[in-house]
Amino acid sequence: MAKRPLGINVYDAARERIAWTFDNFPRISVSFSGGKDSTVMLHMVMDEAIKRGRKVGVLFVDLEGQYKLTIDHIQEMYDLYAEHVEPYWVALPIALRNAVSQYEPKWTCWGDGADWIRQPPPMAI
């Protein structure tokens, strides 16, 4: 299949789609990992939300073992947009594949009775 130029760059197309989403849905949520892609998406969505005076749900699923700098960045984003987000910081026990041990193929983040790597923030669900 041949390429068909659309006459629009990726950034402008993304902004149009975000605006369309705000036009067509009463509630908007963004899943946020703290990585570069979801950070760019969050900034773009929040630009539109602030322009329209709307709040956005921001979901972060905390797997307990993320790097401190990632957790710090996520908190900074929640703080930056505090007036415009409904924060959903989820820190619940979730069974995960354990790629660092052949003896324990599963690891449960935030497991009951386990010593946690760090404490979840007070706002965590």
Labelled PLM ranges:
Residues 1-125:
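ATP-dependent adenylation/nucleotidyltransferase module used to activate substrates
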